[in-house]
């Protein structure tokens, strides 16, 4: 339930290999099952429809050698095509979410919020708010010190002040700008606030 727990869950999910449809029996890691297929009901995706058809055909005794050969011929291409379509759909969903979050935060420019540092790089850090909006604090916009990215400890450290911005750290920010075209939100930390 903590902000750190949510962050760790998201980072673990991001680090996992992206799922794809395949004709190979690979089991299910999370369920520790050697044999696995998935489908949703009601049917939401073409692979769900395809596996429903195959299971129904098998239950009714229609899965003959000829039909199995047919599926062995067409399903590898179906798996590749549907995996690529799903990646495109996921990307469209992410872009739509970003656009709506930018549009929402446009009304909150100048306001202050408390969030958690969700990502760090050599050019800044990301802060995620409790409402899942994520914005960037750019190092170029930070006054009073020069911050260096410590990749080993996943933190930014001020050369002069030794002030640190660490992954999972709670920070108070102010919304300074949004860009609808780039779908970005810029934050600045509010001074003298550090819960760690």
Question: Model regions: which residues?
Answer:
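Divalent-cation-assisted or electrostatically stabilized phosphate/pyrophosphate-binding catalytic cores
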Residues: 162-167
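Short peripheral tails and domain-boundary helices/loops at the edges of structured domains
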Residues: 191-196
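Short alpha-helix capping/helix-loop boundary micro-motifs
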Residues: 100-101, 156-161
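Append "with occasional cross-activation on large, charged helical scaffolds in nucleic-acid assemblies
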Residues: 1-130, 136-151, 169, 174-177, ...
């Amino acid at each position: 339930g903590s902000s750190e727990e949510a962050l760790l869950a998201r980072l673990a999910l991001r680090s996992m290999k992206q799922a794809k449809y395949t004709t190979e029996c690979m089991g299910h890691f999370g369920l520790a099952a050697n044999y696995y297929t998935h489908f949703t009901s009601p049917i939401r995706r073409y692979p769900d429809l395809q596996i429903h058809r195959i299971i129904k055909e098998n239950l009714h005794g229609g899965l003959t050698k000829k039909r199995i050969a047919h599926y062995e011929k067409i399903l590898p291409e179906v798996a590749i095509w549907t995996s690529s379509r799903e990646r495109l759909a996921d990307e469209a969903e992410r872009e739509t979410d970003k656009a709506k979050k930018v549009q929402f935060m446009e009304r909150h420019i100048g306001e202050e919020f408390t969030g958690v540092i969700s990502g760090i790089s050599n050019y800044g850090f990301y802060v995620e708010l409790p409402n899942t909006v994520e914005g960037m604090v750019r190092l170029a916009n930070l006054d009073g010190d020069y911050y260096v990215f410590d990749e080993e400890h996943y933190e930014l450290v001020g050369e002069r002040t030794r002030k640190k911005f660490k992954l999972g750290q709670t920070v108070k920010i102010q919304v300074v700008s949004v860009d609808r075209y780039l779908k970005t939100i810029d934050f600045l930390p509010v001074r003298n606030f550090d819960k760690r």
